[in-house]
């Protein structure tokens, strides 16, 4: 009969595995007695917590996070804890759900505590791809200095689309940056400069919430494809823009 492994030795064994797999050993459920005892683990990547039996965990194939492996179903409450943990790490606030929570593709609304930017992103991209504040990623959009809301006409294989957005740079310069890697022909058909970038950001959000966006594939327009829509939305966007300007510029 083999020597009984002590609790201390077991925890050392578990910790070594966890360090190698980017996991954290949280503790035991009940007292440790033998190989059939249950432990609690936490994934350091996605923050998922689960409780396997020790003998199951020690199998090589079981030494990975079930959520990262796509084998776990998250409750809404678990997702919110996961999101809040990630937000605390990144310097963001979790404001709300953009729509009803269904799965990893559901969208959330976040706020950057550094620059005040508010944006929406899917859980999958935020947690697994580390997608962060769009303003910080673009070099620091400043909400306190002038910025321009613009509309571009894009032509791809004979079909017209729209691309809207905001920039603290010259509109034509921004268009040249976007067109460098684009398969579309670009032209600016409307622009309005606000005294404060926060106003331009507010208008952009109004438009995003009102039209169907992301109609062009990222392979066609790598920079800014999420703010594309059908050309038939032009009148709607111009109407929203005029109303926004009249209501906010006194």
Curated annotation (Swiss-Prot):
Key words of the record: DNA-binding, Endonuclease, Hydrolase, Late protein, Nuclease
Pfam families (alphabetical): CapR
InterPro entries: CapR_dom (IPR048793)
Top-tier EC class: hydrolase
Keyword field contains Metal-binding: no
GO molecular function: DNA binding; endonuclease activity
Species, as recorded: Escherichia phage T5
Tree of life domain: Viruses
Parts of the chain that traverse the membrane: none
Name used for this protein in its record: Putative endonuclease
Described purpose of this protein according to its UniProt entry: Putative endonuclease.
């Amino acid at each position: 009969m083999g020597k009984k492994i002590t609790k201390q030795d077991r925890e050392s064994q578990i910790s070594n595995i966890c360090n190698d797999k980017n996991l954290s050993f949280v503790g035991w459920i009940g007292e440790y007695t033998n190989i059939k005892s249950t432990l609690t683990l936490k994934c350091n990547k996605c923050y998922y917590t689960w409780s396997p039996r020790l003998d199951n965990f020690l199998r090589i194939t079981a030494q990975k996070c079930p959520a990262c492996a796509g084998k776990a179903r998250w409750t809404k409450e678990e997702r919110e804890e996961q999101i809040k943990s990630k937000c605390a790490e990144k310097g963001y606030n979790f404001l709300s759900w953009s729509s009803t929570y269904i799965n990893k593709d559901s969208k959330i609304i976040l706020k950057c505590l550094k620059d005040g930017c508010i944006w929406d992103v899917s859980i999958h991209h935020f947690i697994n791809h580390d997608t962060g504040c769009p303003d910080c990623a673009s070099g620091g959009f400043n909400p306190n200095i002038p910025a321009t809301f613009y509309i571009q006409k894009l032509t791809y294989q004979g079909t017209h689309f729209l691309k809207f957005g905001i920039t603290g740079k010259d509109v034509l310069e921004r268009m040249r940056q976007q067109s460098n890697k684009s398969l579309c022909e670009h032209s600016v058909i409307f622009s309005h400069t606000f005294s404060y970038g926060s106003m331009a950001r507010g208008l952009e959000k109004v438009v995003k919430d009102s039209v169907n966006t992301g109609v062009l594939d990222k392979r066609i327009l790598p920079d800014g494809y999420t703010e594309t829509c059908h050309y038939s939305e032009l009148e709607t966007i111009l109407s929203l823009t005029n109303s926004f300007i009249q209501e906010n510029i006194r």
